[in-house]
Amino acid sequence: MRSAVIVTMLVVVALAALLTQGQDLKYQEREMVAELAQQIYRVAQAPWAGAVGPHKRNSELINSILGLPKVMNDAGRR
């Protein structure tokens, strides 16, 4: 119980920090942060459920694969 409260507080602090910097994030970075926050929340609610891993739909997998060249190109410009 104590660990769940601590993890929840850490998530709240992390999200508060991200919300103050959220305007600087690109759409893909925001999506990544949201997915990470969902995973942390799932682990805090039910630690045994997080071990299974996130399940993506086929459309999400296809979109992420199709978006790889753009992400790699953007990363190369930095």
From Swiss-Prot:
The modification Alanine amide is found at A75. It comes from the Eukaryota. The keyword Iron does not apply. GO terms for cellular component: extracellular region; synapse. Expressed in eyestalk tissue and cerebral ganglia. It holds the Pfam family Pigment_DH. Its main location: secreted. The keyword Signal applies. One of its GO terms (molecular function) is hormone activity. It is found in: Secreted. One of its GO terms (biological process) is response to light stimulus. Keywords: Amidation, Cleavage on pair of basic residues, Hormone, Neurotransmitter, Secreted, Signal. Residues 1-22 form the signal peptide. Belongs to the arthropod PDH family. The pigment-dispersing hormone causes the migration of the distal retinal pigment into the proximal end of the pigment chromatophore cells and thus decreases the amount of light entering the retinulas. May also function as a neurotransmitter and/or neuromodulator. This is Pigment-dispersing hormone peptides.
